């Protein structure tokens, strides 16, 4: 998975 959800904030791993 390229995008991971954290605190409703999408960021690229």
Swiss-Prot record:
Domain of life according to the entry: Eukaryota
Residues with PTM Pyrrolidone carboxylic acid: 1
Keyword Secreted: yes
Primary subcellular site in the record, as a coarse category: secreted
Site residues (Cleavage), renumbered to this chain: 10-12
Quaternary context: Interacts with NTSR1. Interacts with SORT1. Interacts with SORL1.
GO cellular component terms attached to this protein's record: extracellular region
Family: Belongs to the neurotensin family.
Localization: Secreted
GO BP annotation list: blood vessel diameter maintenance
Coiled coil: none
Reported function: Smooth muscle-contracting peptide.
Keywords attached to this entry: Pyrrolidone carboxylic acid, Secreted, Vasoactive
Protein name: Neurotensin
Gene encoding the protein: NTS
């Amino acid at each position: 998975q390229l995008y991971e959800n954290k605190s409703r904030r999408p960021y690229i791993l």
